[in-house]
């Protein structure tokens, strides 16, 4: 596919004079273009929903969510994956990010790494990919060889595949099971897909991981009840979450949090039901980790 035929590589007619504008006017142009991004993502919600349902289903079966991309796309996948353990209390293996060129490419551009299909395949092979996993290929253009190679290999293995691109009719679309293609239009600076395309990709990734984790019971109301309290900030957050969920006395909250080794979910259930730790844990296990379901079971029992 020729670059000049890609929407993401087009020249934006609204920013032709951006090099001659005042600082404020220049920034207004950028901001006006950024406003188009959430609208483009909104149009893709039906496809994002399909992906979330598949991801949640596979994670429940013990599978993994693996993001793979090059450059900005790869970094965004790693960013999203790295936030899942502290936010949702999951094993770091559950959601992973892979970038063309390896870890050094997270901090420094390794431009030629994206040009080899075999490298994408090899990087996924190292992960012992299986049919229980979901591979999300991220490429603004939808044509990055490294990502396409990875997706083709994922299909061979029987893993479910999702593509994220900002070009609607890309090579990627022909490969994946679910295509997510928010069309954000040409960039403010021609071809600089770290801008609108990158923002769109980040919004989609937010939805994929957050949506899947909600469906796994990692959220109660809108509270992150599986947060790992590994530092002072997160310990304070854990206390606040329990307070918001239960409205209990702060001394009671602190006491039970310490008893449960700062297990927020268990603490909430113990306070709301009056059960001891063993009984609350048993109830939570029967509810597959869903607080709302556990409360319903307890209510029906009484």
Curated annotation (Swiss-Prot):
Pfam families: GKRP_SIS_N. Transmembrane segments: none annotated. It comes from the Bacteria. The active site is at 83 (proton donor), 114. It catalyses: N-acetyl-D-muramate 6-phosphate + H2O = N-acetyl-D-glucosamine 6-phosphate + (R)-lactate. Keywords: Carbohydrate metabolism, Lyase. The keyword Magnesium does not apply. Residues 55-218 form the SIS domain. GO terms for biological process: amino sugar catabolic process; N-acetylmuramic acid catabolic process; peptidoglycan turnover. CDD domains: SIS_Etherase (cd05007). GO terms for molecular function: carbohydrate derivative binding; carbon-oxygen lyase activity; ether hydrolase activity. It is an enzyme of class 4 (lyase). Homodimer. A lyase-type mechanism (elimination/hydration) is suggested for the cleavage of the lactyl ether bond of MurNAc 6-phosphate, with the formation of an alpha,beta-unsaturated aldehyde intermediate with (E)-stereochemistry, followed by the syn addition of water to give product. Belongs to the GCKR-like family. MurNAc-6-P etherase subfamily. This is N-acetylmuramic acid 6-phosphate etherase. It comes from Thermoanaerobacter sp. (strain X514). The lineage of its organism: Bacteria, Bacillati, Bacillota, Clostridia, Thermoanaerobacterales.
